[in-house]
Swiss-Prot record:
Membrane topology: Peripheral membrane protein
Family annotation (NCBIfam families): modC_ABC
Description of how the protein assembles with itself and partners: The complex is composed of two ATP-binding proteins (ModC), two transmembrane proteins (ModB) and a solute-binding protein (ModA).
Pfam family, one: ABC_tran
Isomerase in keyword set: no
Catalytic activity as recorded in UniProt: molybdate(out) + ATP + H2O = molybdate(in) + ADP + phosphate + H(+)
PROSITE patterns membership: ABC_TRANSPORTER_1, ABC_TRANSPORTER_2, MODC, MOP
Organism this protein belongs to: Pseudomonas aeruginosa (strain ATCC 15692 / DSM 22644 / CIP 104116 / JCM 14847 / LMG 12228 / 1C / PRS 101 / PAO1)
Superkingdom of this protein's organism: Bacteria
Localization, UniProt: Cell inner membrane
Protein name: Molybdenum import ATP-binding protein ModC
Mop domain sequence ranges: 296-361
Higher taxonomy: Bacteria, Pseudomonadati, Pseudomonadota, Gammaproteobacteria, Pseudomonadales
Binding positions (ATP): 33-40
């Protein structure tokens, strides 16, 4: 059976973890929440490093823990890869020998990832004979990820793998994580404090608060939920994955078709082949509303939308409007004055003017 079934209950001094999740068996699921919400503890339970009094861990049909059957597979027998904030490479071994450490744990007939494939995916072929002290922080982390992949895991756990890197190094490593997502059919549980990382990498989002699941769902739907604290953040917005239809070389604009509709958006981007999927984020503060389409506007992206819901924010001046754009969620943060002037109400049809689009690549 495909899918991840995760259920834990364990009490700690001043904290209780109580998790009950059914997650997709492929793609990247992000565990997101404030410090102390239980993200890393959840990963440790999955790995068998924290034996919960009550628990179940089933990964695409393979059960590693089921307290009802008194079943507990030892951590070293669980087919998972674990990537931490620090690569934890063996300082006395070359990169090649560090990678061999992960590879030798798996019989040749059972290997799903080979050395050459892992090196190519992470772009580390030229580093194989170096010692760890001669690697940058980003290079060390890429080697650590490759070593985890070479254990041929059925599940990859990543506990804030970019937290110790500066912005430049993060920017260097994110494309490699996207390649893993695209080219390997290994489910990933990804812990992060960074909304930008989550928006760029995740397919599914789990929001944790005080050891419990506050929300779980596809990234686009969950970010658009106005009942969650994420919607009140200054950088609140939605993530959409469009399909490239064409490129205008005269203006350097890509045309993207929105999922499940004929609606299109244009973004400044280098040429991409038709059919290529491109993920982007639209922030609520960058969306304004109009009762009619203004074709004379400098704003390129104007979409017909329907009002779904209006909610108060934590400021006296603004409201948040949840919109439907051809089946795609959209958020707009506007003033209360504008709400009253436009006489907005659920079900109303109007136009969303998107002033800025952030391509997540």
């Amino acid at each position: 059976m495909d899918g991840l079934r995760l259920r834990f209950r364990r009490a700690y001094p001043g904290f209780e973890l109580d998790i009950d999740l059914a997650l997709p068996g492929r793609g990247v699921t992000a565990l997101f929440g404030h410090s102390g919400s239980g993200k890393s503890t959840c990963l440790r339970c999955i790995a068998g490093l924290e034996k919960a009094a009550e628990g179940e861990v089933t990964i695409n049909g393979e059960t590693w823990q089921d307290s009802r059957r008194n079943l507990f597979v030892a951590p070293h027998r669980r087919a998972l890869g674990y990537v931490f904030q620090d690569a934890n490479l063996f300082r006395h071994l070359t990169v090649r020998r560090n990678l061999a450490f992960g590879l030798k744990r798996i019989a040749a007939a059972e290997r799903r990832v080979e050395l050459e494939q892992a090196c190519a995916l992470l772009g580390i072929e030229h580093l194989l004979e170096r010692m760890p002290e001669r690697l940058s922080g980003g290079e060390q982390q890429r080697v650590g990820i490759a070593r985890a992949l070479l254990t041929s895991p059925r599940l990859l756990l990543m506990d804030e793998p970019l937290a110790s890197l500066d912005l430049k190094r993060k920017g260097e490593i994110l494309p490699y994580l996207e390649r893993l997502h695209e080219e390997l059919d290994i489910p990933v549980l990804y812990v992060s404090h960074s909304p930008d990382e989550v928006a760029r990498l995740a397919d599914h989002l789990v929001l944790l608060e005080n050891g419990k699941v506050r929300a779980s769902g596809p990234i686009g739907e969950t970010l658009a939920r106005v009942d969650l604290p994420l919607a009140l953040d200054d950088d609140a917005g939605v993530v959409i994955e469009g399909t490239v239809s064409d490129h205008d070389p005269a203006y350097g604009l890509l045309t993207l078709v929105l999922p499940g509709s004929a609606l299109q958006m244009r973004v400044a981007h280098a040429p991409l082949a038709p059919g290529k999927r491109l993920r982007f984020k639209v922030q609520a503060r960058d969306v304004s509303l109009n009762l009619r389409d203004d074709a004379q506007s400098s704003i390129l992206n104007r979409l017909p939308v329907r009002v779904l819901e209006l909610v108060d924010t934590d400021t006296a001046a603004h409201v948040l409007v949840r919109l439907d754009a051809g089946g795609n969620p959209l958020l707009a943060r506007i003033t209360r004055y504008s709400r009253d002037q436009l006489q907005l109400r659920p079900g109303q049809l109007l136009w969303a003017q998107i002033k800025s689009v952030a391509v997540l690549a």
